[in-house]
């Protein structure tokens, strides 16, 4: 009799724990990833809603100036007419559309470090962590970037 209750209690506790895990993962992934996100502690991007999609612009750079003290420009852009744009304030993510719960697909990411525009998909893995798959053509040949959200980020005017 006690053994039966013990097993029943363990099963109930395991079921409750499983429901809590499922509820937590759904609540984390149903959030919209608007806010400030850090890429590799070098770039902060503000992700925002734009015409029903997600976009992102650079709001902070670890090194916003050239060694000569000039603002960093988009010098590697394949379009010569855009090479004088400042990196600070530059929109580098656009077109991300909501897909399955917690996923955004169909977006583009412009990387000013190489002047290439990539396809991007994103998934909010926790309320403070986003995984972005960056690729050209097929996702399997791309790279994954982990972004960290921190609403308390303090910027010292480096952008």
What are these regions (language model features)?
Residues 34, 39-119:
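Central antiparallel beta-sheet cores of small beta-barrel/beta-sandwich binding domains
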Residues 137-159:
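Edge beta-strand at a domain terminus
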Residues 100, 126-128:
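Residue-level recognition of beta-strand termini and adjacent short loop/turns
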Residues 50, 125-126:
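Structural motif
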Residues 12-22:
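Bacterial N-terminal signal peptides
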Residues 128-136:
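Low-complexity, intrinsically disordered Gly/Pro/Thr-rich segments
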Residues 23-36:
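N-terminal helix-cap/turn-to-beta initiation motif at the start of protein domains
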Residues 2-14:
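Bacterial N-terminal signal peptides that target proteins for export
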């Amino acid at each position: 009799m006690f053994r039966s209750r013990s097993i029943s209690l363990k099963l109930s506790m395991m079921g409750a724990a499983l429901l809590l895990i499922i509820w937590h993962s759904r609540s984390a992934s149903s959030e919209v990833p608007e806010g400030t996100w850090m890429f590799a502690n070098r770039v902060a991007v503000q992700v925002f809603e734009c015409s029903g999609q997600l976009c992102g612009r650079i709001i902070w750079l670890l090194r916003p100036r050239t060694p000569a003290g000039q603002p960093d420009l988009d010098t590697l852009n394949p379009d010569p007419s855009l090479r004088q744009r400042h990196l600070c304030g530059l929109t580098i993510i656009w077109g991300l559309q909501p897909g399955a719960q917690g996923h955004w697909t169909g977006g583009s990411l412009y990387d000013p470090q190489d002047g290439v525009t990539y396809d991007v998909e994103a998934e909010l893995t926790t309320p403070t962590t986003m995984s972005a798959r960056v690729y050209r053509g097929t996702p399997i040949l791309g790279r994954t970037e982990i972004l960290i959200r921190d609403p308390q980020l303090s910027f010292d005017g480096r952008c």
